[in-house]
Amino acid sequence: RATFNEDISGWDVSNVTNMSHMFNRASSFNQSIGDWNVSSVMSMGYMFRDATSFNSPIGNWNTSSVTNMSLMFEGATSFNQALNDWNISSVSMLNYMFSETTSFNQDIGDWNTSSATLLNYMFKNALSFNQDISDWNIAANASVTGMFDDTPSLSNLNKGQIHKTFSSITNWPNEWSIFVTYEPITDANFQDAVNLWFSDEANATFTYGHIRDWNTSAVTDMSNAFDSRSNFNEDISGWDVSSVENMSMMFKEASSFNKDIGNWDVSSVLSMY
């Protein structure tokens, strides 16, 4: 197996359902198989494990039936091909998928990971990987132990973005909150941020942080901010409103609001009608 490197590009694999271990330790294999019809394949676990020479494009594969990609590229040290178009919406097992895949650094941020439950050690020792996967939809009970162990190329910016999404996972092991950054709140976006909070709280939190933690020190106009927001009752007592000049109708018809904001510095406010 280690010396196998024959041309098998013409194989009809349309009926194959299991390709697990297919090129496991085929260290010489690097043939073009990108045109294979893999639409029936359900398991690709260990498929290219330790296939150290393999670096052929397979980004056009139809992977919609695949449920298992565990250890798929583990130790495939040469592999660095685009995979972002793969449909992995049925995949539950991604554990060790890119472990020891030392060259891999492709954008996979658009993957639909809603079925994934096992992601432990997925990028362990993926020494080149530096991508933002913060848009992934991961279940709170998913296993992510060691997911990013020994990923020295992962930037602090990407760590922060990933942490925003992954920190809600029960066993998320990384304390990357120090790398988290949010879009600054200014007069230009304050009302947009408030509106987004009510229409899509998760997105607002991802973009601006939780509303209670917003840095509003640059905002001068908060007029009508919570006008008619009858359900609003978040604790915004920590807001810095020292620059605000206009608070007119800020809480108009915000009938549920009942938080203590008595310590606000309103010395710059000119209008509170």
Mark where each language-model region is.
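Negatively charged
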Residues: 1-273
